[in-house]
Amino acid sequence: MSEKAIAVKAQKVEEIADQFKAAASAVVVDPRGLTVAQSTELRHQLREEGVVLEVIKNKVLTRAAEKAGYAELNDIFAGPSAVAFSNDDAVAPARILKKFADENEALEIKGGVVDGTIANIDDINKYASLPSREGLLGQLMAEFQFSIRSFAYAVKAVQDKLEEESAAPAAEASTDAE
């Protein structure tokens, strides 16, 4: 192999290692058996959520994973491999790939990395069941809103009770004075 080809591969390993390090999650799949239309549809769904899917040679993946500190992933780099990288939403790749794999048996999820932790197939499936970041923030805001509303109602009830109690002695005092 020429020095130029070796330099190109070394640069590719560096790029993929940097993607692993920067990613909120990276999910590895076996795309064997997907038609061109299915592959295009999958890439489109992933791209809408800011996820990039790359088909990468296993040797490059192995070296990049080791360089990024994820040598445990090397066991899943058998057969064709594609990696879905997401820098923003750690759950998006798992959610989209799981849904797509359920609809298309040809796609097999192998495992990956989520928030710096090695994730097996079961872990990926658990992450896939979580709502998106925006969904979780919405749920959190709804809980805050409910708590604040409940507190406001409690304060209003105490205020009303105090007003009734202070109004009652004043009414008694005015009837006694007559």
Curated annotation (Swiss-Prot):
Upper classification of the organism: Bacteria, Bacillati, Bacillota, Bacilli, Lactobacillales
GO cellular component terms, semicolon-separated: ribonucleoprotein complex; ribosome
Native species: Leuconostoc mesenteroides subsp. mesenteroides (strain ATCC 8293 / DSM 20343 / BCRC 11652 / CCM 1803 / JCM 6124 / NCDO 523 / NBRC 100496 / NCIMB 8023 / NCTC 12954 / NRRL B-1118 / 37Y)
Reported function: Forms part of the ribosomal stalk, playing a central role in the interaction of the ribosome with GTP-bound translation factors.
Gene Ontology biological process terms, A to Z: translation
Any one Pfam family match given in the protein's UniProt record, by short name: Ribosomal_L10
UniProt protein name: Large ribosomal subunit protein uL10
Domain of life: Bacteria
Family (UniProt): Belongs to the universal ribosomal protein uL10 family.
Molecular function as annotated in GO: large ribosomal subunit rRNA binding
